[in-house]
Amino acid sequence: MHNKLNEIKKNESPPKVIKNLFSKDEINKFLSLYEQLPTTIHNKKQNVIKKRWLKEYGKELEELFYNRLKNEIGEFKYDNLKTESGDIIFGLFQESYNPIGLHIDGGFNFEDLIYKQSLIPLTPVGSTVIFKNRFYGKSTNFTIDKNELEKTKLNYGQNIRSNKHIGMFGNKPFNKEDHQKFLMHEKINDLLGLEIELVYEWELG
């Protein structure tokens, strides 16, 4: 668990959807930045492309992003990953045509003070499911798949695999209607004890 768990809990708040944070022109600039960035991962099997926001690209956009977010959540510091040469990464762009599995973005260092997570959709197609339940470990992909759980030799910046969420939040079966509507890509038994807090249907801006 994180060393600053009490401080993390004090900073917790319900999910908040901020509309019109960025203009249409600014969104187009982010899309242009995405096209310029080199591809980090292209998983053709899962149809996912990931690109790191390297510091050599879009410095003005980074300042814009930081200041807009600071106006909403107050002063903060990025939980930056680094490149192979030790340079910081501003963030991660992800282009996916399939749903992303159950996970948390809890950072990779228990010394860090996790504050807020931000998600900026660059397309109006898609949604994000946020749960009421809280898990205070490092960045983790949750699964009951034995093959996934055996993956322990992970690269820098990859989420660990875990099934520790099973039973952690009780044994109440997951809502079948919610499963069919939002989470058919997950095995319902993998959602044991979980409860949805918000389903955010993406909007530009």
PLM region spans:
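Non-heme Fe(II)/2-oxoglutarate
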Residues: 1-89, 97-99, 143-171
